[in-house]
Amino acid sequence: MEVRDKLKDNQGIIMATGSTEQHGPIGLIGTDTICSETIASSVAKKANMYLAPSIGFTPAEFNMKFQGTISISAQTFKSLLKEVTSSLLKHGFKYVLIVNGHGANIDPIKDVMIDFNNKLFFKSWWDFPTVNDIRNKEFGDLEGMHATPSE
């Protein structure tokens, strides 16, 4: 199906943001992106929306001492997010919904949202009540948010 055909049926597009950073000996370097992509993909399927390619290179300077981490500045991330969002809106999507997977992305995303007058929205994957219910049921007090089995 062509993008123009999908735009006839739906107005928005979903995009995941994550990070490329360490997650200890049990986690993958791309865990933040994998988690947000998984949830974004499920939402896109249920809502019959397109899923844009994910943004996995984001601010993670605090983890640069761990080999494998790739960090970009918050300003570079904001510029990238602005240009990607502008492109999607220019092509006819009415809004962009971000499913975020990295805490350091929150403030830059909020900063960029201001420029888009209610056409850019976000929710971090850990803010979905169903996700929290599953995490609490499966891991209880062992839930630690970062580099833990629930992630």
Regions found by a protein language model. Give the residues of each.
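Active-site and ligand/interface coordination hotspots across diverse enzymes
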Residues: 1-27
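Short, charged beta->alpha transition segments
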Residues: 3, 39-40, 81-86
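Alpha-helix C-terminal capping segments
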Residues: 7, 43-44, 113-117
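Structural motif
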Residues: 11-13, 49-50, 96-97, 119-120
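Glycine-rich loop at the start of a catalytic domain that most often binds anionic cofactors/ligands
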Residues: 26-33, 65-68
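Short catalytic helix/loop segments, enriched in acidic residues and glycine
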Residues: 32-44
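Short glycine-enriched loops at secondary-structure junctions
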Residues: 49, 55-58
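Active-site histidine-anchored catalytic micro-motif
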Residues: 57-150
